[in-house]
Amino acid sequence: MKFNELLEVTKDIDLEALGVSLGKAANRVETISCFQEGDEWVMQEVDDRQRVFEKRGKEEDIVRKIYGNIKLRIR
């Protein structure tokens, strides 16, 4: 799955209410985000103590991880 496909399948989901940000870095407690930085894709998580954790990789890998996280947050 590519980023544009992720945007399409999540267009009817209130991502902000789930604590998900697509296309820009997360900056609130308990949020997760996915964005491109140069040639790299980044998944960034902010925990309850405002610590930031990043995973970097290929677009498909990062998008797959964030989509899985979105599905878990919906439950």
What are these regions (language model features)?
Residues 55-73:
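A short, charged, amphipathic alpha-helix used as a generic interaction element across diverse proteins
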